[in-house]
C-alpha cells in the first residue's frame, strides 16, 4: 500500500504542479504500480487511468510527459530526482515505479 502523504511530498519536492492533469495521472499510476508491481504502463496503467478520466491512453501518457517536462524545468529538479536514485530524464514508467517504491508503506 502506498503512503499518499509521502507521495504528495515527494512529487512536491520534485516540482510537480497541481494545476497539471499529468500530475494527478502520475500519482494514480504510482498507486497502481505499488499495488501491482508487474503492471505495465501501456497495457495496464494508461488504459485504467484513461477509463477513470474519460479520455484516451495516449492523452494520459502525453499529460504525464508534459507534467514531468514542467517539473524538470523547476529549480531543484536534478538534486531532488538524484536523491530518489534517478538520472536526468526518467520515462513515465521509471518515474512511477520509483515513486511507488519510495512511497510504499512497507519501506
Predicted regions mapped to residue ranges:
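Basic, alpha-helical nucleic-acid-binding regions used in initiation and control of genome expression
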Residues: 3-12, 20-24, 28-29, 36-107
Amino acid at each position: 500500500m502506498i503512503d499518499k502523504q509521502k507521495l504528495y511530498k515527494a512529487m512536491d519536492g520534485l516540482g510537480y504542479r497541481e494545476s497539471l492533469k499529468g500530475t494527478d495521472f502520475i500519482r494514480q499510476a504510482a498507486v497502481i504500480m505499488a499495488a501491482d508491481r508487474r503492471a505495465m504502463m501501456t497495457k495496464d496503467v494508461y488504459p485504467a487511468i484513461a477509463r477513470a478520466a474519460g479520455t484516451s491512453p495516449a492523452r494520459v501518457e502525453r499529460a504525464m510527459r508534459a507534467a514531468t517536462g514542467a517539473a524538470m524545468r523547476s529549480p531543484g529538479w536534478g538534486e531532488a530526482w538524484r536523491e530518489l536514485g534517478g538520472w536526468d530524464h526518467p520515462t513515465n514508467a521509471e518515474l512511477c515505479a520509483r515513486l511507488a517504491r519510495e512511497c510504499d508503506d512497507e519501506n
